[in-house]
Amino acid sequence: MKISTEIDSIAKIVGMEKAVELCAKAGFDAWDFSLFDMCLIDWGTRLPLQRQHPLNGPHYLKFARELKKIGLDNGIVCNQSHAPFPVDAPAIRAFLKRAIECTAEAGGSICIIHPDNAKTAEENAEMYLELLPFAKEHGVKIATENMWNWDGEKDESSFAACATAEDFKKHLEVIDDEFFVACLDLGHAEMRGSGNGAVHMIKTLGHHLQALHIHENDRWHDNHQIPFSMDMDFDAIVKALKEIDYKGYFTLEACHFLDGYTEANVFEGVVKLRESATKLADMFENQ
């Protein structure tokens, strides 16, 4: 089982180029191309923030190629990417094809694009069907992901697109295309109030499940912490992945684990992330 991790949390400390290099040096097999800097928005107004980054400039493909080369020079590949979100913001929607382009240019085979939390499977299909021909031209699969909302009165998560196994599968079946697959966010699936558990979702999704966002939580909040640090049952989760013969990467999205790290010690944190991913991979291989 090959392992990967998102690079956004590392890049916030040392930049994207160095982040890819550190992933390789820590022992990951691959890197997950975080494309959020392509378009950052004000979550209140849904309007774009003015911020300069290679991903939102004219030479975005050149930047993607440079990251790919850094990875290859250090022995790792890009396995997948994460498009900017939320997709209900027009500014974000305008960059989704660019996200697919960058994924292909970096060598990734899957681009995770969130559904609109508030829309049905049929409504979200309109966006995905618009993007699929472009994705196919670039040899990139689109993966949708299980989401959540927050109920302030109950102080817990609440239903959103793909939050349950049944709604997730419906999103896939409405489109019914081999280039449209599932990325299961294990942490989201375990949040109280919205999902119905990672194990149930894994078994329901079956062969549709081709990508993962792996992180840890207290089974209440979306903590995005390092695996084995909180309350999730990874033994049961890995067993379920083995049962469906999961063939994708084990990709971490423990994006808050490095919050307290600095440029001086971030590599130590990346190594700890790699160690947690290796433990999960070993558990899978030894089932």
Over which residues does each language-model region extend?
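Histidine-acidic metal/acid-base catalytic patches
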Residues: 1-29, 36-40, 65, 72, ...
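Solvent-exposed loop/turn segments at secondary-structure junctions
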Residues: 10, 84-86, 117-119, 149-150, ...
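Structural motif corresponding to the early beta-alpha repeats
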Residues: 28-126, 136-141, 247, 255-257
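Short glycine/proline- and charge-enriched loop/turn segments
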Residues: 46-52, 150-152, 220
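Short glycine-enriched, charge-decorated loop/helix-capping segments at active-site entrances
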Residues: 48-57, 157-158, 224-228
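Active-site cleft segment of glycoside hydrolase catalytic domains centered on the general acid/base Glu
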Residues: 118-128, 154-161
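Histidine/acidic residue-rich metal-binding segments in metalloenzymes
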Residues: 127-129, 133, 173
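Aromatic-lined carbohydrate-recognition surfaces of secreted/lumenal glycan-active proteins
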Residues: 143-152, 184
